A protein has these predicted regions:
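C-terminal charged capping/lid subdomain of soluble metabolic enzymes
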Residues: 2-7, 11, 174, 285-352
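A short, small-residue-rich loop immediately preceding and capping a beta-strand
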Residues: 85-108, 112-123
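ATP/NTP phosphate-donor binding region
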Residues: 1-92
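Solvent-exposed alpha-helices and their adjacent loops that cap or buttress functional pockets
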Residues: 8-10, 33-34, 85-88, 109, ...
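Short glycine/serine/threonine-rich phosphate/pyrophosphate-binding segments
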Residues: 48-51, 100-106, 125-128, 248
């Protein structure tokens, strides 16, 4: 009999607080996690106004804090924040903002072996609780290994103040899990790729939960934020279990990353993934109309025109998608789509 040698490490958020005025308990969360007394707040100008200043004021009596203002998650900004953290001799970090501030903190936390608390001010994607980060460069966005936050404080009051477009984008990103899971299942059949059933089911729960509540997710309703936060966090946790982004990222994300290369900074990540999921579910011969109807109910875009892309952008991205992550087997296969097939796919799903 062969000797069993398998071993795996998984890191999850330990303290998750969701709800109305949740940041009022930031000191309690940090004390319960026993971080030490020297902290760094990583934020941006707008997100500092949204939540950073209040966190700073609430913690200043008990902690030696330094606030760092930064921008997009680029290698340069990661290095700058890392140097500031080391200079302050910080024992923990607080990431206050949208995706970029949390992504920077994830990478720095991994590099320096430091705990951090994620305090999202908007939820335009499902990365709040995951151990992956999106690092931007001139050639587009790259998913890199990082570390999940030790704690999460999701203040529904704060998040509800952000533009509703961000919330709808986060929902679309989680809904797109359905095609990622189809791709993962397909790869396990075709290539014997290992598939985690627990990560699979958690990711599926997250997507189905948002679809089932799609008619209750509306602009200006704090309850809408409450409804989606658990699925968004669960989606991130599924990646922690799998040890990669497979439960939440497949052909629809490859399409999205191709759009980032073709026409960067045109639409939000989740918006692009939602549109990609409509088309990729059609390739899987699944219920793509259910995805589209759910996105429409939420208020997320389902067409090129709604997101600022041209018909050629969509077609070019569909053709390019197969080359984004060649090691990841999806419904696109090795050869991908011809331009004619891509055009037909986008038209039959009414993306163009």
């Amino acid at each position: 009999m062969a000797t069993f040698t398998k071993i795996k490490s998984m890191y999850f958020p330990r303290d998750v607080l969701i709800g109305h005025n949740a940041i009022h308990q930031v000191v309690d969360v940090c004390q319960s996690l026993r971080f030490g007394k020297k902290g760094i707040i990583i934020t941006g100008q707008d997100t500092y106004k949204a939540a950073g200043r209040e966190v700073e004021e609430r913690m200043s009596k008990d902690y030696d804090l330094k606030t760092i203002f930064t921008g997009n998650a680029t290698p340069e900004n990661v290095k700058e924040v890392s140097e500031a953290v080391k200079s302050h001799e910080a024992t923990f970090m607080l990431a206050i903002g949208g995706g970029s501030k949390i992504d920077i903190s994830k990478i720095v936390a991994k590099d320096l072996d430091l705990p951090f608390v994620s305090v999202p001010t908007s939820v335009s994607h499902d990365g709040i609780a995951s151990d992956r980060a999106s690092l931007k460069s001139d050639t587009g966005a790259q998913s890199v290994e990082a570390v999940a936050p030790t704690g999460i404080i999701a203040d529904t009051t704060v998040i509800n103040e952000a533009p509703y477009r961000f919330l709808a984008s986060g929902c679309a990103d989680v809904i797109s899990n359905l095609t990622a899971l189809k791709d993962w299942e397909f790869a396990s059949w075709m290539t014997d790729e290992e598939m985690s059933s627990s990560a699979f089911m958690i990711s599926k729960y997250a997507a189905e939960n948002i679809i089932e509540n799609s008619d209750r997710i509306k602009p200006g309703l704090e309850e809408s934020v409450w409804l989606i936060m658990r699925p968004i966090i669960a989606s991130g946790v599924s990646m922690c279990i799998a040890g990669n982004s497979r439960p939440t990222s497949g052909s629809e994300h490859m399409f999205s990353h191709a759009l980032d290369v073709i026409r960067p900074n045109t639409a939000l990540h989740g918006e692009q993934c939602g549109i990609g999921a409509i088309m990729m579910m059609h390739l899987h011969r699944g219920d793509w109309k259910r995805i589209k109807d759910s996105l429409i109910a939420i208020g997320a875009p389902t067409t090129a025109a709604e997101t600022g892309f041209t018909e050629d952008d969509i077609i070019d991205a569909l053709v390019m998608a197969k080359d984004i992550r060649k090691e990841r087997f999806t419904v696109l296969g090795d050869k991908g789509l011809t331009r004619t097939a891509a055009k037909n796919l986008a038209r039959v799903t009414k993306v163009i």
